[in-house]
Amino acid sequence: MKKDVVAGIGEIGKPILKLLSKQNITVGFDLKPDLMNQRIFEKYKNLKTSFLHIAIPATSRFSKNVLKLSKKFQPECIVIHSTIKPGTTAELQAKLSIPVIYSATRGV
């Protein structure tokens, strides 16, 4: 059994977390602990991570933050939902041995 992790539970991450939770074991992670469901996070913390969904702000430290999150959760694959500059996915892919996927966020 594995879990998915959504990093960044804001405008983008919260709906992704809600949707994925319907079919998969999914936990949210955020620097603001009050946004996280600590009970769920603790319950599944020892499960391996299948997908790490990135929904954090694209600051100048974005790549470094993604690498830290990858080290923390050790996922099999990373999916970036944040709006990022061209070349960021390739830059991260060159530094990681797992697939890195960019999934553009689209409004309705």
Positions of the model-derived regions?
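Structural motif
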Residues: 9, 30-31, 55-58, 81-83
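Rossmann-like NAD(P)(H) cofactor-binding subdomain of soluble oxidoreductases
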Residues: 51, 60-108
